[in-house]
Amino acid sequence: MTENKKIDILMATYNGEKYLSEQIESIISQTYTEWNLLVRDDGSSDNTCVILTEYEKKDSRIKVIKDNKGNLGIVKNFEELLYNSNSEFIMFTDQDDVWKKDKIEIMMRYIDDSDLIISDAIITNENLELQYESLYSVVNSRNGIVKNIIKNTYYGCCMLFKKIILDKVLPIPENKEIGHDLWVGLISEKYYKVKFINEKLLYFRRHSSNMTTINKSKRSIKAKIIGRYIILKELAKRFREIKKRTNY
């Protein structure tokens, strides 16, 4: 049973002052209350850190990770947060979305017989006005390593997973073709149980700073082929390492 199990929610921030408070408030308002929000800022030049400090003072569940590692980029920022996580269950959150108040509660109902679950989302514009009813329908979300190498449908903001997967996920390869969520999804498909659930549990906000997270079609065919080759190469390398270490 997962009732009252602690969850670490990981947030990597960078110049996110515009929507940050709205996202954090939606987490604070969750019906499931056994969570910690771990945040690491990646060198913001706006008021992001001021906002985070205020929330950290107001809610003991919110913890800002401070270190001297400087700007790591989004993937390594999330990786650092993964290394700092101590709870049995982990979620990613973006700095600009809005969670439905029962997002965690509903996802925890599904996690018992899976290791990674991924929910649907409602896609909105920057003002939270409806653009698409379903993220699944836009990106054709479904299981499969090859399918998701061709077009990634693993979105970190829609994930809940068990900490046990980190044994094989970490470290995340240092390559711009490999996002933290794509890597978590691919490794989980190989070694663990992954389930897509038909629940729309957040408002996925699209704005000028994140539009490419759904549509990368402007890349050339050559660039796409090279990118997928790099992903396959890194996967094969990790599979060999895991086989050598675990004989699996």
Language model features with spans:
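Short aromatic/hydrophobic "clamp" motif used to bind/position activated sugar donors
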Residues: 90
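Conserved nucleotide-sugar donor-binding catalytic segment
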Residues: 83, 143-215
